[in-house]
């Protein structure tokens, strides 16, 4: 049997082999440690929106797709400057108001605090500012929020969440404005900005199935003959109808508002509505201002003021001359 002798290889081949082994080791190490060093904490939300609408979160009707699962309407606010200069960093402040005393139904049926999340659709060319461009004062307002692009290569559509609502009723987005002198595809002018913000869990999964953060209705008319509690904490409500018994499965979380022996109609609520959250949408505008126009406006206004001053001085001179002639 011939034994492998590494030294028998030519020096050039040995160097190439060593380099390939080192590259392979480095690649494997990077793959194994990337999740530890840089965990993708934001993948939990908005996973559903990205899966159901992978290209854009805004439908042709103008509605943000989050509204398909978060059925309740709640307010959402955004504050941005009316106009910004090229290559400048500004704040886009998103406000998601709700009652801090509210408790939502969690997946296991227990109660807990509300989470918040938002999707911000900026104009083309606008994006989250890199860390070295964010002022120190603005850094303090961010609070360690992780900003994620909705789609790879689409930096102007940004998503955050889920975040604890009691800490992030206001979310500050550090936005970097584009520079038309560096990007010929960007032009000065007015642009639309779209915001979608939610608080709490959704009522419908993308598959169409209702979550336990929902009110459940009777699928048939009849009389409730039996109510049984399940091991998971929910209920099985048996409705005796003309076609036979029908069992309604209700997960843990919603509270029953019916009782055995009660006659019900189709579509009648069997539970209360536990949802305390909701989704809000807000549209606004931002102007990418041309610095040259601002300078021109300043010069124009300065010229007008100078003319007015000269006219006042000239008027005083005329009045002085007229007064002197009258005295003469």
Curated annotation (Swiss-Prot):
The chain crosses the membrane at residues 294-314. Its cofactor is heme. Pfam families: Apocytochr_F_C, Apocytochr_F_N. Residues 1-44 form the signal peptide. Gene3D superfamilies: 2.40.50.100, Cytochrome f large domain, Single helix bin. Component of the cytochrome b6-f complex, which mediates electron transfer between photosystem II (PSII) and photosystem I (PSI), cyclic electron flow around PSI, and state transitions. Its main location: membrane. One of its GO terms (cellular component) is plasma membrane-derived thylakoid membrane. This is Cytochrome f. Belongs to the cytochrome f family. GO terms for biological process: photosynthesis. GO terms for molecular function: electron transfer activity; heme binding; iron ion binding.
């Amino acid at each position: 049997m011939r034994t492998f002798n590494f030294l028998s290889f030519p020096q050039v081949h040995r160097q190439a082999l060593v380099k390939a082994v080192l590259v392979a080791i480095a690649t494997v190490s990077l793959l194994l440690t990337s999740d530890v060093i840089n965990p993708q904490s934001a993948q939990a939300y908005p996973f559903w929106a990205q899966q159901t609408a992978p290209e854009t979160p805004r439908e042709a009707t103008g509605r943000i797709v989050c509204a398909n699962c978060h059925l309740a309407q709640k307010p959402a606010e955004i504050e941005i400057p009316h106009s910004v200069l090229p290559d400048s960093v500004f704040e886009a402040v998103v406000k998601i108001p709700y009652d801090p005393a509210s408790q939502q139904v969690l997946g296991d049926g227990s109660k807990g605090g509300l989470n918040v999340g938002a999707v911000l659709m900026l104009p083309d060319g606008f994006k989250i500012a890199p860390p070295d461009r964010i002022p120190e004062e603005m850094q303090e307002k961010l609070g360690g929020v992780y900003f994620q692009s909705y789609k790879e290569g689409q930096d102007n559509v940004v998503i955050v969440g889920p975040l604890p609502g009691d800490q992030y009723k206001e979310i500050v987005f550090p936005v970097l404005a584009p520079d038309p002198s560096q990007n010929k595809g960007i032009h000065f002018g007015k642009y639309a900005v779209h915001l979608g913000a939610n608080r709490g869990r959704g009522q419908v999964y993308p598959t169409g199935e209702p979550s336990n953060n929902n009110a459940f209705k009777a699928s048939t008319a009849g009389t409730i003959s039996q109510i049984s509690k399940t091991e998971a904490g929910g209920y099985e409500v048996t409705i005796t109808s003309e076609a036979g018994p029908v069992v309604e499965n209700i997960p843990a979380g919603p509270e029953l508002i019916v009782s055995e022996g009660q006659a019900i109609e189709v579509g009648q609520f069997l539970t209360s509505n536990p949802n305390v959250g909701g989704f809000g949408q807000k549209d606004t505008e931002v102007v990418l201002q041309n610095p040259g126009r601002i300078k021109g406006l300043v010069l124009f206004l300065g010229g007008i003021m100078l003319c007015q001053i000269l006219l006042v001085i000239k008027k005083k001179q005329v009045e002085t001359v007229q007064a002197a002639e009258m005295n003469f």
